[in-house]
């Protein structure tokens, strides 16, 4: 209460910050007449002038006022658009590295040009991040006109570009692209072998559009480049047949936590099924040999109980395609990890794709935290302000609208059942359709959108494709005649190709659009329809310029007429019934776009995004949610008390309860879910930071190695450290020679480097110490390497050293990632032993990293000591190293190795292999027993160095 009084008296911190910007806005406005008087050439020359001032010692902050005035004038001359004062404030917030919350239709795309231009003057590259390729291309082409006018270059990064195209795009002053492409390019760059092959040139400043979607909704989704493992599709199909044979009493499902676990009875039943199928090793399901089987059983159980077709995923073209729970879009190329996707494929009886091994990964949280300065834009960020600050140190600033919002957000209507709710939605749609008010009905999933479509179809409505000109003409004709056409369109992941058309025409009089969350972001819905879309469609075949101009004028008049129809589509509703002689009390509800929500989402932001499609730039509009106690949010998060209360109130079938208290109760439920999800993301980030710190060390090492012309000093240090480790393992410090493990040392030297070094003879010498042994071994190794340099030449050996070092580092890093994944899956069990899983994970991960470093020294030393160069048939320059060309969608690894190999590579009969002479073994399968006779698999013995 005191806080509310203080805010009223002094204003909120947001109000004070906006007020502080006003002085700079006034200064920019004061410059406008002088800047407007400049010629095009003089305006363009200001860019060079600003850069010169920066070089002379001025800061970007010093240049903000004249730079913003310059961009505003360039926008007027190129696009015919002038930045409003509130847009200038938005640009200042972005430049300061914070989040500008701007409502729908307030021109976020134009706002970004201010901060982009100012920061691009530094010459370090500015990245603008969008949610899809369409928006990246659209915004780069559209806003690129401003930058080009001012002498700056614009690039765009979309899927399908080759390396050279990406390099050119990143070399531009301002680069537009999607969050996925930026992240994957970073990972791909850190799998290359030459600096000149890398695409990105640093992480100076990024502006993230729809920042809440990318930095919060997708924060838990890691970007993974992967390669296929062995095919185990039959195993997945076998496991899948067991799940339908379980009863509901055989497992417990927790929908709140999205988890499922077998009961005692379920375990016994699964054990019996596995034993009968010959898939159970040992006596018990939980024997150590069955760890993998238990994992696959759990994933199959999750696939059947927690994941719903047409809600969490769809099946298309023999594939399981994930549906983004926040946007409703198909996530082509994305796959669930840890065998879950394969379990879903087995469940749906489509082709089970092989599991993949992680080659490189990063989360959006860690990728975007690499930028020196990060900023964001969205229409809905205030509800997540705490998370933005805690994780990214970004403050949310609510930018005032240029025109006051005229949308009416009504209280929710709550029904007992979904059937009653759908009947109420149908009645409301019919009322709106009769007065030609366009309606957008928001749903939470594909399944729900199709249920609503079925309700409309059964009531005499017809589904059409808004991309079909003939179907649209029926809608236009009905609007001109003032009659409802009873036509509707569905926008969900199944019809994503029609998205642009559906959104463009959703504001036409009488239009009914049923949409998933796909309609929540991106293109604005304009009242009366989209002028650009209609001109594009209706004048494409007209070649005569005069005829085309006349048609465009007709379209403009048509759309203005439609706009007025929509604006006047007001509704009069009864708010108090008639009593005796007293007439009923009514109230007017505004026209404009009518948003109907068919259920609340877990996040308030998603609901606010849906409401935000209406009421753009001061247009009237209306929004209302229709709910039932059977909705997911109400059902999972405790509708029992509410149901009891409604029963006591004597609520009849078909009646709804409407009260602000209901809205507050729902908001509290949503806040609880948001807080829980925030805690999950925060906890996951703590674990991911452990891997991220190691990733930075490895990637920084790679960059340093790639910068060096020669890594001879590095590999020499690694070789000497390896020898020290080997000697300390077999020779106790200050011990007598009789106490040395000479046989073990000799055997390991032979196994690792293939040299018969007379350490047994040295050990017999009088007075020899461990330090002397170390010096002699280093000398033998160094002389062996010097002989190879003499044989092949220093240039070839320097190339071989660098190639082998980088490739071995990459190989061991991949294996290390797998180890970390496995560790992370089981570390939670340490909590039962009263130990902190996070601290345990940090400690274990550090130990694994130390082991990987030791393996790297050993493997690089072993390979360089054994390396043989295969000369080309004709003398030629050494070719550049091929790079990993990883497709993030397929996970295919097209890496080609350099012209350096270990010889020999031909297959040799097992009987001809000498266990003591590795050079006689030829090519050995990784899963074969090692020919040395150790009893280990080749990949875990000598194969570690192959």
From Swiss-Prot:
Main localization, broad class: membrane
Reaction(s) this enzyme catalyzes, per UniProt: ATP + H2O + cellular proteinSide 1 = ADP + phosphate + cellular proteinSide 2
Example GO biological process: protein import
Binding-site positions, Zn(2+): 930, 932, 941-942
Membrane protein topology class: Peripheral membrane protein
Signal peptide range: none
Region of interest (Disordered), ranges: 872-892, 904-946
Top-rank EC class of the record's enzyme: translocase
E.C. number: 7.4.2.8
Binding site for ATP: 87, 105-109, 524
Record keywords, A-Z: ATP-binding, Cell inner membrane, Cell membrane, Cytoplasm, Membrane, Metal-binding, Nucleotide-binding, Protein transport, Translocase, Translocation, Transport, Zinc
InterPro entries from the UniProt entry: Helicase_ATP-bd, P-loop_NTPase, SEC_C_motif, SecA, SecA_CS, SecA_DEAD, SecA_motor_DEAD, SecA_preprotein_X-link_dom
GO molecular function: ATP binding; metal ion binding; protein-exporting ATPase activity
Pfam families on file: P-loop_SecA (PF21090), SEC-C (PF02810), SecA_DEAD (PF07517), SecA_PP_bind (PF01043), SecA_SW (PF07516)
Record text on cofactor binding: May bind 1 zinc ion per subunit.
Compartments where located: Cell inner membrane; Cytoplasm
Listed Basic residues bias regions: 936-946
Needed co-factor(s): Zn(2+)
Family: Belongs to the SecA family.
Subunit structure: Monomer and homodimer. Part of the essential Sec protein translocation apparatus which comprises SecA, SecYEG and auxiliary proteins SecDF-YajC and YidC.
UniProt function note: Part of the Sec protein translocase complex. Interacts with the SecYEG preprotein conducting channel. Has a central role in coupling the hydrolysis of ATP to the transfer of proteins into and across the cell membrane, serving both as a receptor for the preprotein-SecB complex and as an ATP-driven molecular motor driving the stepwise translocation of polypeptide chains across the membrane.
Protein name: Protein translocase subunit SecA
Organism: Rhodopseudomonas palustris (strain BisB5)
Gene name, Swiss-Prot/TrEMBL: secA
